[in-house]
UniProtKB/Swiss-Prot annotation:
Native source species: Schizosaccharomyces pombe (strain 972 / ATCC 24843) (Fission yeast)
The gene coding this protein: rim2
Gene3D superfamilies in the cross-refs: Mitochondrial carrier domain (1.50.40.10)
Record protein name field: Mitochondrial carrier protein rim2
Extent of the Solcar repeats: 32-136, 146-234, 256-345
GO cellular component labels: mitochondrial inner membrane; mitochondrion
Topology relative to the membrane: Multi-pass membrane protein
Principal cellular location given in the protein's record: mitochondrion
One GO MF term attached to the UniProt entry: pyrimidine nucleotide transmembrane transporter activity
Amino acid sequence: MLSNSEIKPSENSQKTKVLLTKANNASNERAPPPLSHFIAGGVAGMLGAIATAPLDVVKTRLQSDFYKDRFLKQTAKSKSPLTAAYRHFMDTCIILKNVKVHEGTRALFRGLGPNLIGTIPARSINFFSYGNGKRILADLFNNGQENSQIHLMAAAIAGVITSAATNPIWLVKTRLQLDKKSGQAAQYRSSIDCIIKTIRLEGFRGLYKGLSASLLGVGESTLQWVLYEKFKHAVAIRQLRRKELGIQETIYDKVLDWGGKLGGAGIAKFMAAGIAYPHEVVRTRLRQSPSINGTPKYTGLIQCFKLVWMEQGIVGLYGGLTAHLLRVVPNACILFGSYEVIMHFIG
C-alpha cells in the first residue's frame, strides 16, 4: 500500500499540469486582436526609451573604443569582479556628469530621435511577431497549447525579423551618439546627413554593418522571452489556485501579481543581458564611423571579437556592462509593464 508521502508528489505534479493547461486555455480563449501587440509594443518601447535615454548614451560610449584609453585601462587593473563592477558604475556616473557639464543636458538625449524611430517600430515588430507567432506555432505544432519550445521558436523568429528590419536605424543612432562635438565640428548634422554620408562613403551595405552581431544577439531576446513567460506562468498559476479555492482577490494580490510580472521582466533581462553582452560591444564597434583615413578598424564579426580580445581582453568585451544593466533592467520593467497594461485595456 502506498504511503501519503508517495502519493502527494504525484498528485501535486498532476495538479500543476492541470493548472498549466487551464492557464494556456484561458490565454487562448482571450486571444487579443493581432494588431494590439503591434500598438502596445510600440507605445511601451517609446516610454522605456525616453526614460532610460541618458544611460543609453553612456552605454554606447563605454562600448566604443573612443573611451577605452581613459576608462577601460583602470577597470582592467581590477582583479576582483566586484571592484570592476564598482569601477564600471563610477565610469557611468563620471560620463553622465561630463556629458552634462561639457556638452549640455540635451547631449544626454543625443540620438534619442533615431532611437525612438528605431525603438518604436522595433518593439512593434518584435511584440507583433512574437505575440502572433507563438499562437500560430502552438496551433500548428502543439494543438494550440503553448510551452517553452513554442516560446523559443516564436522569440527566435521575431528576433531575426526585428534585427533585419531595423539595423540601419540603430547604425545611425550609434554614430550620432559617438559623434563628439567638443573641440571639433560634428561629423553628422542630422540623421538624414548620417544616412547620406554612410551610403556615399561605404555604400548601401554600410547601413547593415553590425547586422551579424545583431543576429547573434537574437539569443538574448529569445532567452528573455522564454524566462519572462516562465514568470508569467507562475503568476497565472497562482491566480488560478486562488480562483479554485474560492479566495477573493484583494488589492494586495493584484499588486503581488503585477510585481511578479515586473520583477520577472527585470530578472529575465538581467540574466539574458549578462550572458549575451559581448555581442553588444562588438555590434557597437562594427557600427562606428570609419577612422579619419576612411579605413574601418573593424571589418567583420570574428575579426572584431579577436581584435577586442587581443587589445583589451575579456574586460573589453564587457565594457559598459554596468551602464547597460542600469538601463536595460529598468527599461525591461517599464517596457513589459507598459505592454501588459496596454494589452489589458485594448487586447
